[in-house]
Amino acid sequence: MIAKLKGLVDSVAEDHAVIDVGGVGYLVFCPARVLTRLPSPGQAVALVVETQVREDHISLFGFLETAERDWFRLLSTVQGVGSKVALSVLSVLSAGQISQAIAAGDKAALGRAPGVGPKLAARIASELKDKAVALGGMPAPPPRGAGTDAAGEGPPGGPTGDVLGDAVSALVNLGYGRSEAVGAASRAAGLGATTVQGVIGLALRDLGRGGA
């Protein structure tokens, strides 16, 4: 099984690249986000590779980051998601954005990928939610009032569910996607923000830098 290719970019097409490794050209299917980041032909490149062996052919799928390869594998485990759809998702969302979208249940973000309809987006979000959190996605904020004690106070040192929920709602109203709003608000809370204004302020700064 081929797990990595290190060589020279020979050519780049719409859905694949040919990598020259010691005079042998390997055709590697890649997400569009990867293809646009490859160096010019003749330049060195290293790709993390997933090898799929079928009865009549062997296919190589290449990625610049291990996290991209890991998400390709996970997406491919969902019924209705083949290699083509998995590449489609990774073409419109980075590995981090996929984690955030699934952890937040943001089916609209997943549905931006060609071939992913509402039902398939819901299935992906449902089946991979736990894995998304494990891979760095931030879970959606708890429902309003959740996680508070009898006095209505949140856990020491952190914002209440009401605060996170209100901050996320405000960010969404400003035009940000729910998944990126959840991620930015959660990171703001991790930096010590405990009020709606504090969370929004840090989150907007985070979003202005393009997120984590």
Swiss-Prot record:
Pfam families assigned to the protein according to its UniProt record, in alphabetical order: HHH_5, RuvA_C, RuvA_N
Keyword DNA-binding on entry: yes
GO biological process, one term: DNA recombination
Domain II as annotated region, ranges: 65-143
GO MF: ATP binding; four-way junction DNA binding; four-way junction helicase activity
Keywords, comma-separated and alphabetical: Cytoplasm, DNA damage, DNA recombination, DNA repair, DNA-binding
Region described as Domain I: spans on this chain: 1-64
Flexible linker: region residues: 144-158
UniProt keyword Ribosomal protein, yes or no: no
Disordered as annotated region, ranges: 136-161
Family membership: Belongs to the RuvA family.
Cited HAMAP family: DNA_HJ_migration_RuvA
Name of the protein: Holliday junction branch migration complex subunit RuvA
Organism, scientific name: Rhodospirillum rubrum (strain ATCC 11170 / ATH 1.1.1 / DSM 467 / LMG 4362 / NCIMB 8255 / S1)
